[in-house]
Amino acid sequence: MTTDRRFAAFSKNAQPPRMRSVPEGGMCISAFLVISRKGEPGSILMGRINKNAGWDHIGAVNQKNLERFASGWMLPSSHLILFETPEGAARRILREQLGIRNQALEGPLTFADTSGTSNHWDLGFIFKGERESAPSSPAWEKLTFVNVADLREEEMVRHQVDVLAYAGKFPTK
């Protein structure tokens, strides 16, 4: 039997051709770092972004979302650059957002989510690690270990609760 369905398989050479466009609401492929303080698994490295740090380049945060993202706690994260591997994105986030060149990471864990009425798809890769102290970086107004059990969902940037829950760091409701 032959089908005219176009399955959501992304490949340069798929035969027959598969997906020719993205979902109406868009699709984001991102990497997230969930770094806990050594010996304190509930204390996670999060920050409030510095709006003047070029987040359109280092984290794929567009001008529209910059204000909203600056007001909440956010994990070090970014969309993947076209053809970048999830592991490559995690290493780039370490360098560009945290100024770290050598950090052990486990992962990735993967998660998928849809949001909004416009059928937006999110595919995320989560990398976990541990550190004894928070780095200092000009990308962040504030970068510190936060006890996530003390945070309310509305204090975090969009999807951070989901990422932390998938990583086993946030109690699910």
Which residues does each predicted region cover?
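N-terminal strand-loop-strand
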Residues: 2-74, 102-103
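Glycine-/small-residue-rich active-site loops that bind phosphorylated ligands and cofactors
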Residues: 27, 81-82, 151-152
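NUDIX/MutT-family hydrolases
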Residues: 71-73, 126-128, 134-171
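Short histidine-centered catalytic/ligand-binding loop motif
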Residues: 73-84
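Structural detector for helix-capping/boundary residues
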Residues: 78, 92, 96, 146-149
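Conserved acetyl-CoA-binding loop-helix of GNAT-fold acetyltransferases
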Residues: 85-91
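Active-site segment of metal-dependent pyrophosphate-handling enzymes
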Residues: 91, 95-133
